[in-house]
Amino acid sequence: MRAPQHNSDFSRTVDQLADDPNPYEPEIGSMPQNDLTRADLDNVNKTGTTTIGISTADGVVIATDMRASLGGRFVSNKNVQKVEQIHPTGALTLVGSVGGAQSFISSLRAEVNLYESRRGEQMSIDALATLAGNFARGGPFFAIHPILGGVDEEGSHVYSIDPAGGVMEDDYTVTGSGMQLAYGHLEQAYEEDMSNEEAVSVAAHGIKSAVERDTGSGNGVFLCEITDEGVDIHGHHDFDEVL
């Protein structure tokens, strides 16, 4: 295949495209960078994890376990909060490498704040999900698979965001190493138009089911309740406190 001639219209277009910014970059600044290789991921802290998101008649309920592991062989932390508020009425879970997930959350939170300060209104949850998918696809956030939940004028929303940037909305979803165990419970217990109180019990039972058999999940449950009034997050090492 012949190379384009120097200074031809085509070569100048190629040079211009090479200098264009990444379409997935944030509005201000640039995407966080790292030089991790795939092999390095075997030796970083990971959340392992089971995370659950349920859309309800009142809003959204998110539940996660509390365990982080090192290399999948050692429990490095027993009290990890794996769900963080990133929007006045929205929250995101940490799934995968801890550093990548934390950087992902910080980047999204900054974009949400910037949007509100520039436009004088809150970003919709659907727009936030699209932004999260773009960041996951175009950024350096290795091995993340979070759940985004939130409430806006259109109602309550739950999305799973895969490592390639795929965004899927559903009534309920589960991600992480214990997802198969938790899904078994949710398939039986989920009902349409549940209240947040009912969904808390269903989600906590789902996390408990995963903790029983999944070595990457354990040590308790964090529960996040989202309504149009805000986000409330609380943790429990003893499942009996919420079941």
UniProtKB/Swiss-Prot annotation:
Control of this protein's activity: The formation of the proteasomal ATPase PAN-20S proteasome complex, via the docking of the C-termini of PAN into the intersubunit pockets in the alpha-rings, triggers opening of the gate for substrate entry. Interconversion between the open-gate and close-gate conformations leads to a dynamic regulation of the 20S proteasome proteolysis activity.
Alphabetical keyword list: Autocatalytic cleavage, Cytoplasm, Hydrolase, Protease, Proteasome, Threonine protease, Zymogen
Q: Which residues form the propeptide?
A: 1-48
Residue ranges crossing the lipid bilayer per the database entry: none
Record InterPro entries: Ntn_hydrolases_N, Pept_T1A_Psome_bsu_arc, Pept_T1A_subB, Proteasome_sua/b, Proteasome_suB-type
Chief site of localization: cytoplasm
Please name the GO terms of the biological process aspect recorded for this protein, alphabetically. proteasomal protein catabolic process
PROSITE patterns assigned? PROTEASOME_BETA_2
Q: Might you give the EC number(s) for this enzyme?
A: 3.4.25.1
Q: Where is the region Disordered?
A: 1-34
Has UniProt tagged this entry with the keyword NADP? no
* A GO molecular-function descriptor: threonine-type endopeptidase activity
Which sites are catalytic?
Answer: T49 (nucleophile)
Q: Name one GO cellular component term.
A: cytoplasm
As its record notes, the protein acts as a catalyst of: Cleavage of peptide bonds with very broad specificity
Please tell me whether the keyword Magnesium is annotated for this protein. Answer: no
Where is the protein found, in the record's own terms? Cytoplasm
Q: What is said about its interaction partners and assembly?
A: The 20S proteasome core is composed of 14 alpha and 14 beta subunits that assemble into four stacked heptameric rings, resulting in a barrel-shaped structure. The two inner rings, each composed of seven catalytic beta subunits, are sandwiched by two outer rings, each composed of seven alpha subunits. The catalytic chamber with the active sites is on the inside of the barrel. Has a gated structure, the ends of the cylinder being occluded by the N-termini of the alpha-subunits. Is capped at one or both ends by the proteasome regulatory ATPase, PAN.
Function of this protein?
Component of the proteasome core, a large protease complex with broad specificity involved in protein degradation.
Q: What is this protein called?
A: Proteasome subunit beta 1
Origin organism is Haloterrigena turkmenica (strain ATCC 51198 / DSM 5511 / JCM 9101 / NCIMB 13204 / VKM B-1734 / 4k)
